[in-house]
From Swiss-Prot:
Cofactor note text: Binds 2 magnesium ions per subunit.
Family as reported in the entry's similarity comment: Belongs to the ketol-acid reductoisomerase family.
Name the record gives this protein: Ketol-acid reductoisomerase (NADP(+)) 1
Chain positions recorded as Mg(2+) 1 binding sites: 191, 195
Pfam families: KARI_C, KARI_N
PROSITE patterns: KARI_C, KARI_N
KARI C-terminal knotted domain segment(s): 183-328
EC class (word): oxidoreductase
Function text: Involved in the biosynthesis of branched-chain amino acids (BCAA). Catalyzes an alkyl-migration followed by a ketol-acid reduction of (S)-2-acetolactate (S2AL) to yield (R)-2,3-dihydroxy-isovalerate. In the isomerase reaction, S2AL is rearranged via a Mg-dependent methyl migration to produce 3-hydroxy-3-methyl-2-ketobutyrate (HMKB). In the reductase reaction, this 2-ketoacid undergoes a metal-dependent reduction by NADPH to yield (R)-2,3-dihydroxy-isovalerate.
Length: 332
């Protein structure tokens, strides 16, 4: 079973005694910086010249400085810019400002796991990753609660890296809910697999295949959209609240019987075998290399895929149907 840590296991004074730089001010960056500040931590935000986030961070009472200056001032540096640019930011603005005893923190392990960033031997390398979007992390913190986090140490130069990670997690409210100890390898590989095989890739492909099966059989696209995409939220919400058991308790017996007898015909042994291939490509670095090559090569295929899906009948049908739904905010 996983090791869990709570408020009583973490010493907030450790992070309160450090100088923290949060690099980036997106979804997670703003939640980390504001919550650490409110926990009595000395925080500055590091942003590149011309960042649109600068005004927002300053309006919220945070000190904003260039990334290199933030890294030079701080002894705990949390990198929360997008994965594909982390190595560039590290090489340009952070690497030469690291001192022995400093700590390099990440919210996701990709760049460490695949060696795109190679920290010096004298610094701690840690991860603190809330299992929820930044706005939820911040809201829960403000309400006196927290979002569960995972924490890991890749390099313990000081001998106190995990205690520092727990202290950081406490500063953003994570230990109120619970912190699970993991490794950079486990977090990275399971996160990428979940995104690709289930949450994003698997779900999107399943929805499209179901929609196409119905429309190709002559059913109206609008009806197919409701049955294969719109109602997915109802099911996922039930699973989120109480697992498969609550979902099955809440649906009709007809739907539940169909679940048992038809689900295995859709997700077959062949599907699971393909999932294992996907996992192997994540484990051996193939996916990470291909993604970085695609990103730094100009995102040609990425943009082609994006354009194709935006023109799919599923998307054009949904865009029109959502106009009928006053409770759905198209701008959100």
């Amino acid at each position: 079973m996983a090791e869990l840590f709570y408020d009583a296991d973490a010493d907030l004074s450790i992070i309160q005694g450090r100088k923290v730089a949060v690099i980036g001010y997106g979804s997670q960056g703003h939640a980390h910086a504001l919550s650490l500040r409110d926990s009595g931590v000395d925080v500055r935000v590091g942003l590149h010249e011309g960042s649109k986030s600068k005004a927002k961070a300053e309006e919220q009472g945070l000190r904003v400085v260039p990334v290199a200056e933030a890294a030079a001032e701080a002894d705990v540096i949390m990198i929360l810019v997008p994965d594909p640019i982390q190595a560039e930011v590290y090489e340009k603005d952070i690497k030469d400002n690291l001192k022995d005893g400093d700590a390099l923190f990440f919210g996701h392990g990709l760049n460490i796991r695949y060696g795109f960033i190679k920290p010096p031997a004298g610094v701690d390398v840690c991860m603190v990753a809330p299992k929820g979007p930044g706005h939820l992390v911040r809201r829960q913190y403000e309400e006196g609660r927290g979002v569960p986090c995972i924490a890991a140490v890749e390099q313990d130069a000081t001998g106190n890296a995990f205690a520092l990670a727990l202290s950081y997690a406490k500063g953003i409210g994570g230990t109120r809910a619970g912190v699970i100890k993991t490794t950079f390898t486990e977090e990275t590989e399971t996160d990428l697999f979940g995104e690709q095989a289930v949450l994003c890739g698997g779900t999107a492909a399943l929805v499209k295949a179901g929609f196409e099966t119905l429309t190709e059989a002559g059913y109206q696209p609008e009806i197919a959209y409701f049955e294969c995409l719109h109602e997915l939220k109802l099911i996922v919400d039930l699973m989120y609240e109480g697992g498969l058991e609550k979902m099955r308790w809440s649906i009709s017996e007809t739907a539940e019987w169909g679940d048992y007898v038809t689900g295995p015909r859709i997700i077959t042994d062949a599907t699971k075998a393909e999932m294992k291939k996907v996992l192997a490509e994540i484990q051996d670095g193939t996916f990470a290399k291909n993604w970085m090559d695609e990103y730094h090569g100009g995102l040609k295929k990425y943009n082609e895929y994006k354009k194709q899906d935006s023109e799919h009948l599923l998307e054009t049908t949904g865009k029109e149907l959502r106009k009928l739904m006053s409770w759905v905010d198209e701008e959100a």
